[in-house]
Amino acid sequence: MKEKKNACTGCAAAEADGRFVRHPESADGEAVVTAYPVFPGIEIAYCDIHAHECRLEYTPGISLMRISHCREGRLEQQLGNEYYFLAPGDLAVSRSDASDEAARFPTGHYHGITVTIDPAQAPECLSCLLSDVNVRPAALMEKFCANGGYFAARSSASVEHIFSELYSVPEEIRKGYFKVKVLELLLFLSALPTERRRPAYSGAQVRLASAVSEYLLSATEERPTTAELSAKFHASATQILQSFQGVYGMSPAAFLRAQKMHAAAELLRFTDRTVLDIAGQFGYDNASKFARAFRSVIGVSPNAYRSGATADSCAPV
């Protein structure tokens, strides 16, 4: 039977192509961050998370700007008593000293890119790298992070254009391409209006959604209706659905199906059990029905996923 390999927690190992592979500490899963230096004080990192929480690199007294793009899953950001959730396709700009050093992922599954900038180490103005790119990293951080330290924009064609190609960059052009795309991203942000912001959720809404999810996962064979959930948690159906959708990005039923399929994917990655055996564990006695459910969540069939399971990463190969 296959077993997980234990990685050195938090270490960064330099690879031949200049990247660093980090393994942030996580209590309930696996987190891998593949980072590439781009310019002085600027790096691009590919985040592959199969956990609900991990510890970020954090240096007290140093204020960094993080530009995050979510490809899959969901990223939680807490600012005071408000919670924001980054969904697939969304972009967020945050300041490291304005948020907790722990990153949280409600669905336990996240893939995305983070561009980190240290204004104290980065060029004061990017025009020194390319003429007419009159962008100052310190001014960008002031623009997006002055009021609370967080800004988020919903998925758009412009954001997708910038980030989509970064997930499949050929190795032979990678270093130069990263430079071009980071400059494009920062130039785009310099012209982006700041009034766009995803809605915030209260601690009460987050706690309600979390309680519902824990209940669903404790009894996966049951399929409670919204009315039954409403009675159990003493909240209206509207409160439950709005809170759950806000935190997890899907209905309770879709969430439960997704959690089952991601758990099945873990078994496909790390064990030699047959697909039919794994299907039975999650309540499917028909391999075809399981394959359809698996494909609807993961995007490929169980057999195709298993054959390419080592590539469960958003970093370019």
What are these regions (language model features)?
Residues 1-14:
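Short Lys/Arg-enriched alpha/beta "domain-start" segment
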Residues 66, 177, 251:
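Amphipathic alpha-helical recognition patches that constitute DNA-binding helices
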Residues 76-78, 83-205, 209, 226-227, ...:
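Alpha-helical bundle regulatory/interaction domains
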Residues 15-111:
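N-terminal functional module of multi-domain proteins
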Residues 239-240, 244, 289-290, 294:
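Short hydrophobic/aromatic patch on the recognition helix
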Residues 210-218, 223-228, 246-288, 307-317:
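Terminal helix-turn-helix DNA-binding modules in bacterial transcription factors
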Residues 249, 283, 294-295, 299-302:
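Conserved phosphate-binding and hydrolysis motifs of nucleotide-dependent enzymes
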